Design a protein with these regions (language model features):
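Nudix hydrolase/Nudix homology domain
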Residues: 21-23, 78, 82-83, 94, ...
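Acidic, metal-coordinating catalytic segment for phosphate/diphosphate chemistry
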Residues: 24-59, 65
Length: 191
């Protein structure tokens, strides 16, 4: 019994450590204006980038063969755009290739493995926030996969829920101003 309690305590300590490590020790590569790695790193969310320096983020659009897109709703505790709709995405970790980052983010946030999905990289756009230290490239991917409700396992720290929407429904949501990045990525939703 004592050993079991000790193992349980160790398990919870490791879980707490992993959450802390992922939050506070995650590192990102710094890129130049040509999207080349500089060889330097930054801590996650340490917005100290100089003008001309960027980090890399990825977005993974999932479309079913019936033409519907998977979108998720951001949790209300997000500091930026709480409750807004979005597609899966996030930052590439140091040393991680863009394709690996998008596969990881989609799997973490939705439980869906897009490794065997049709599609892939579509385009990149650049977002600059002069003087704020948060400049980034966004690699946008589109995957076509037959996803069913039972395939989805939402990461509750990130999303309130999800839904599948048509192009028209997506445009209606975007018209409310509550779809993250829509103006930058709307071309990926077209045929």
């Amino acid at each position: 019994i004592v050993i079991t309690k000790m193992l349980i305590a160790v398990y919870y300590c490791m879980a707490d450590y992993n959450i802390w490590r992922m939050t506070y020790m995650e590192m990102w590569d710094i890129y130049d204006a040509n999207k080349e790695k500089t060889g330097r790193l930054m801590k996650k969310n340490d917005w100290q980038l100089k003008d001309g320096e960027y980090h890399l983020t990825v977005l993974g659009v999932i479309e079913r063969p019936d033409g519907k897109f998977l979108i998720t709703q951001r949790v209300m505790t997000k500091a930026w755009a709480p409750g807004w709709w979005e597609v899966s995405g996030g930052a590439a970790q140091a040393g991680e290739e863009s394709i690996d980052a998008v596969r990881r983010e989609v799997r973490e946030e939705t439980g869906i493995d897009v490794t065997d999905a049709r599609g892939g990289y579509v385009f990149t756009y650049k977002r600059e926030n002069p003087g704020k230290g948060d400049n980034y490239f966004v690699d946008v991917y589109k995957f076509i996969k037959d996803v069913k409700d039972e395939d989805i396992h939402i990461q509750t720290e990130e999303a309130l829920g999800y839904k599948f929407v048509t192009r028209e429904e997506l445009k209606q949501i975007a018209a409310t101003g509550e779809f993250l990045h829509y103006d930058s990525i709307k071309q990926v939703f077209e045929d």
